[in-house]
């Protein structure tokens, strides 16, 4: 009986080790699937609109200014009342300048806030170069990667909420991979159509010790004009109504 029990215990241990090894492999293999799920959530399967209120620190002229975000597919149209207009895609950012669409300058910001236009791009896995999981715990899955294309950043560290399939925190490193430039936190998520959208975005700059807070009120927008998602649309007034 002692030998039988010992053999059984040995098989149990081996089975547990095999299960743990399989779990580790599954976690490693699931990164691509997780990023695809995050991209699916970030994408606007149906058009949506956010009425945005900007709050920023001393010296920031944009504080109190309303803005509008309109999303469709992988495109985000951005308009700041009385000023900036932009069409943001993962691989291209256009702004209205001189009555036509022009490439955004590297590092161009949302008004004069701590938020770069590229920070607002709809997430796709293609924007990350060799992403790796650096932590996986109750606070979320931490994915570290360099940007794959042209970017103002040297390194991005994203924390992903597995349940919502949404990025809830980002660390942005500029110039060098150990030079933290700013942090972003997304909160107050609401379900809009098939996706989770943040009701609050807070960006804090480490270098300037400044902070920008965006409050977003999302809703579905099935009647959004197609022209706003075309470069030519930046050459004419949007015709959007303001709250």
Per-range role (PLM):
Residues 59-62, 79-80, 126, 151-153, ...:
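Short solvent-exposed loop/turn micro-motifs enriched in small/polar/acidic residues
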Residues 13-21:
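Bacterial N-terminal signal peptides
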Residues 24-28:
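Sec/Tat signal peptide C-region and signal peptidase I cleavage site
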Residues 136-230:
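Gly/Pro-enriched, hydrophobic low-complexity segments
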Residues 63-67, 87-91, 101-108, 157, ...:
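Short amphipathic beta-strand/extended segments with alternating polar/hydrophobic composition
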Residues 2-13:
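Bacterial N-terminal signal peptides that target proteins for export
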Residues 29-98:
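N-terminal mature ectodomain segment of secretory-pathway/periplasmic proteins
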Residues 29-35, 43-44, 84, 88-156, ...:
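Flexible, processing/modification-adjacent segments and terminal tails
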């Amino acid at each position: 009986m002692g030998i039988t029990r010992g053999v059984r215990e040995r098989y149990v241990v081996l089975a547990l080790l095999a299960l743990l090894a399989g779990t580790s492999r599954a976690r490693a293999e699931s990164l691509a699937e997780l990023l695809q799920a995050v991209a699916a959530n970030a994408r606007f399967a149906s058009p949506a609109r956010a009425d945005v209120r900007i709050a920023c620190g001393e010296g920031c002229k944009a504080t109190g200014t309303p803005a509008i975000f309109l999303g469709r597919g992988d495109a985000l149209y951005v308009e700041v009342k009385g000023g900036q207009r932009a069409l943001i895609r993962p691989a291209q950012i256009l702004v209205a300048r001189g009555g036509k669409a022009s490439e955004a300058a590297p590092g161009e910001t949302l008004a004069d806030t701590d938020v770069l236009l590229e920070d607002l791009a709809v997430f796709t896995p293609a924007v990350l170069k060799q992403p790796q999981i650096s932590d996986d715990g109750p606070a979320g899955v931490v994915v570290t990667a360099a940007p794959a294309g042209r970017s103002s950043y040297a390194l991005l560290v994203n924390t992903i909420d597995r349940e919502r399939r949404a990025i809830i925190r980002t660390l942005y490193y500029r110039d060098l991979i150990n030079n933290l430039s700013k942090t972003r936190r997304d909160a107050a998520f609401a379900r809009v159509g098939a996706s989770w959208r943040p009701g609050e975005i807070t960006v804090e700059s480490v270098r300037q010790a400044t902070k920008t807070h965006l409050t977003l009120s999302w809703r579905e927008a099935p009647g959004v004009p197609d022209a706003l998602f075309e470069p030519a649309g930046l050459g004419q007034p949007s015709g959007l109504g303001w709250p």
